[in-house]
């Protein structure tokens, strides 16, 4: 069963108290709690849109919700813009309702408490326009150069929901499994703030290592938005406009109910004051009647008959001690009564004027912003690009070797060091029966290899897709990489630095010559669109 309520405690922050403000004024409906012993609110009055600001995550039967957190100040700015638009539409019905795009000028993107960077804006746009979207979040990572010239990656913020200890372990496992190379050490120097140091080897490229960390670890993760919430008891998928509109509608209902409550209390107090003013104006006679009466009920009845009071007024007089009653000052009572009349007039105007109610909602939102808003923590990179495989590899010089039997590999040029006089050379591959090196070619890691076969076919391979091997390794069968047809064989190949360089491919040519002496010259552009 449910735990006893006495075991459930919470220390509320100042902002959390704003969620409960005016709950005592009959602003929301109440329902019985789990054991029907107490009543609890169906929803909180909440002076700010908590669902947007703090987000939500949960699973129910057949559905789930996952809403990101937002910056309080930005959300309130969006709500104020919605309110201003609503007022304009009251004054001029031809004004169009505020759009999601216009709200996004204020509510720019989710803002996570752990900071990080939203990488790319399409997911945010999808989430705000449709209620569903996939938002990419990157950690804050900076490359620093130490005094000794070595580089290191400093991680200062993590994507929302990422557990730091799990991340560090994952990176260590990838290094041990050789899936990420170039890392010499990892240290967690975090105290109050996150600070994880990744030491980079001298011969490694820190940017390439960081790109691999983004790809293979939670340094880059995604937040899948699914904005489902209960609206009048029914689950609905909400876009940004829907969420803001429902909040403002809720606040309008709260303001109306609070105003009616305040009006009722003000009228009740004014009614009592009318009786007290009559009593003080006739204080001697009132005291005489009370003293002459045998019971409070008799005193009430006598006062009602003599001064035309009703039961509430006479009871208020009789319930006061005579010392209190005689101490009342007529001017103070009249001043309080006059102020109450002004309040009653204002509250009635508020109930009868929708524009004034919107003004109240706007002012209360601005008050919350001035008290509690802070700076955005999560940065936004709108024009982010998808991962380019080239980002995973440094553009190093490579030696490409193809054997007589069709085995291919790439080897870093640095393995073929310069030798002095009398050197015996360096083997590009280990000798094997019936096989030998037939082609040796130098290319950069980001270059594209173009393979031409005896049957006139062309195949493309990026250099980084060619398996790396040392000088003794065999390599991989080229036929398994480019699916050469049976009986066909590579007869020539070249490498091109960048097939996307239009000026280059338009002004360079390939010349073909056949065994029968035929030749042709074709622009490189004709071969610059690789097919899978």
Language model regions located:
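Residues forming anionic-ligand binding surfaces in small-molecule and nucleic-acid pockets
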Residues: 51-57
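Conserved mixed alpha/beta core segments that line enzyme active sites in large multi-domain catalysts
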Residues: 16-48
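C-terminal interaction appendages of subunits in large macromolecular complexes
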Residues: 3-6, 10, 14, 18, ...
